[in-house]
């Protein structure tokens, strides 16, 4: 709650516009995470602590597990892969050039949810802020992030099997109206 008392003559009798920068909610973050410095110390034991953070991974964790405004009545903490979110959160907190000679976190998330929407739509929006996709692996909701990684398997021309007709690839597709 904010209250202001100002003299109208200071603004020439015009209506004053006031804007506020709010930090948002206190959410659960890893116990070895310093949200002010955006650093992780030591090995994480899986425990969480309350703190403010605009790291998209921990905002997503909050939205998925909070019972009042999130999906916490349907999903418990055991149903969400916090270890995948931990790796994603570390990637989001890496410092990158800001274009002005300084650095900034790779990804931040400052959302204000003002209307009720379908859970999947909100989940997709949160995930798109950090270039990841939600995946149900049969036991938990986990996440796969699009980020640079080591080569898993190199494919070269020698890996392509050519049939007797000299064709290496056969392309097939469905009609556009059937998709």
Question: What is the predicted function of each stretch?
Answer:
Residues 3-12, 110, 144-179:
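Surface-exposed, non-catalytic interaction/assembly patches
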Residues 28-30, 35, 117, 121, ...:
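Residues in flexible loops and secondary-structure boundaries
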């Amino acid at each position: 709650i904010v209250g202001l008392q100002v003299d109208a003559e200071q603004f020439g009798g015009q209506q004053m516009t006031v804007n506020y920068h709010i930090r948002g909610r206190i959410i659960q973050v890893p116990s070895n995470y310093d949200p002010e410095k955006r650093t992780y110390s030591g090995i994480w034991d899986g425990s969480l602590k309350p703190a403010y953070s605009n790291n998209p991974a921990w905002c997503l964790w909050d939205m998925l597990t909070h019972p009042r405004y999130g999906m916490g009545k349907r999903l418990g903490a055991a149903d969400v892969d916090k270890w995948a979110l931990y790796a994603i959160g570390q990637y989001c907190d890496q410092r990158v050039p800001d274009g002005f000679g300084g650095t900034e976190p790779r990804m931040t998330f400052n959302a204000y949810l003002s209307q009720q929407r379908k859970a999947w739509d909100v989940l997709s929006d949160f995930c798109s802020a950090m270039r990841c996709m939600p995946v149900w692996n049969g036991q938990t909701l986990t996440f796969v992030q699009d980020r640079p990684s080591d080569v898993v398997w190199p494919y070269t021309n020698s890996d392509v099997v050519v049939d007797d007709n000299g064709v290496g690839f056969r392309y097939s597709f469905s009609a556009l109206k059937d998709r």
